């Protein structure tokens, strides 16, 4: 099921009392297999190997995408680490607020200066959403892409 075509997500957007049900479904049911996996390339395991097991560190995840699906910081969070997750998608940040209340979760597009940029957008929870014009050119050859103006910080 494609997230941006999800009828349930569209209902949850219309009726706020359904949002927590949607978050639970998307984080723990739809993506249950990711609850038992590490990050995509085991970066989190490598980081945990560098520190004593009792060490509680801090992380910064820019472009955090999803609280469980191929997430680089989920294992760290489970080991007691805390940090900051930043993504330009408000739905992603809402899910992080639900799944990781111990973290600071910020909806923002990061840049070296405060300007308006175009967000090239494929869907609510699509990891290919981008601000990069070169990446957009590649996406355009394969996907139906739209854009929105957003402000960077």
What does each of the following model-derived ranges do?
Residues 1-153:
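Phosphate/nucleotide-binding beta-alpha loop and adjacent structural elements of enzyme active sites
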């Amino acid at each position: 099921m494609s997230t941006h075509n999800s009828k349930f997500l569209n209902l949850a957007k219309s009726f706020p009392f359904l949002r927590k049900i949607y978050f639970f479904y998307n984080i723990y049911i739809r993506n249950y297999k990711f609850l038992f996996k590490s990050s995509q390339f085991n970066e989190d395991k490598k980081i945990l190997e560098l520190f004593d097991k009792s060490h509680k560190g801090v992380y910064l995840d820019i472009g955090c995408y999803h609280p469980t699906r191929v997430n680089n910081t989920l294992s760290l969070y489970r080991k007691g680490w805390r940090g900051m997750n930043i993504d330009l998608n408000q739905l992603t940040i809402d899910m992080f607020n639900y799944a990781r209340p111990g973290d600071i979760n910020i909806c923002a597009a990061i840049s070296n200066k405060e300007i308006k940029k175009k967000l090239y957008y494929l869907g609510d929870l699509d990891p290919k959403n981008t601000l990069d014009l070169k990446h957009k050119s590649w996406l355009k050859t394969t996907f139906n892409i739209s854009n929105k103006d957003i402000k960077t910080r």
